[in-house]
Amino acid sequence: MSLPRVGLVVLLLAIATGSLAESANPSAPSRSQSMIDTFQVMCTLELPDFERIAAKATVLRMRPEADSKPSAPGDSGFRSKSWIGNLTTGPFVLLLDETTGPKGKATSCAIVGEVPDLDAFRADAVAAMKLPATPPPEMGNDGSRSFIWDHSFGPGTTLILRDFKPAGKPGIMLKLISAQPLR
């Protein structure tokens, strides 16, 4: 069984197990937990691969939102896709980007959505993904703060948890970037 199929089987089992658990236990997973679970299934079962993640989104019948592949000169290029998904706890957006250049390729997979408590979400994400202590945030000009973990999923990877708490907005983004040098 190929790795993408294994991932889909795991996703379907997680959904089925969750459905069985919900019927036995009326408390559904929290919004934070469902967002973290979705990120782990879509973006971290294997290092981000544009074609495989796009195929997962198609198989899961997620609604395409945007698809762009601007032409670029020479060996460099950029493409991105996004989809809208629905969880029992609310909607989310799946973002997929790939940049190719003379030094290599970087692929990123991200989940974006709203959560009720940004600090609790960050603590839950750190615990669920067994990340080291939360680094100090990098502040953006747009009122965002980004918490960044390098090499958390192996060499050439970066995990970013971004929120807009300083701007008073409830949105979060969990993003895994995998950079691979040219061979």
Feature annotation, model-predicted:
Residues S23-V93:
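N-terminal leader/targeting segments
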Residues P73-T100, W149-K165:
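Amphipathic, interaction-prone secondary-structure segments
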Residues S144-R183:
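Glycine-rich, aromatic-bearing surface loops/beta-hairpins
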Residues K81-S146:
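Long, charged/polar, surface-exposed segments that mediate recognition or autoinhibition
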Residues A21-P29, T100-K103, L182-R183:
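Compositionally biased, proline/threonine/alanine/serine-rich low-complexity intrinsically disordered stretches
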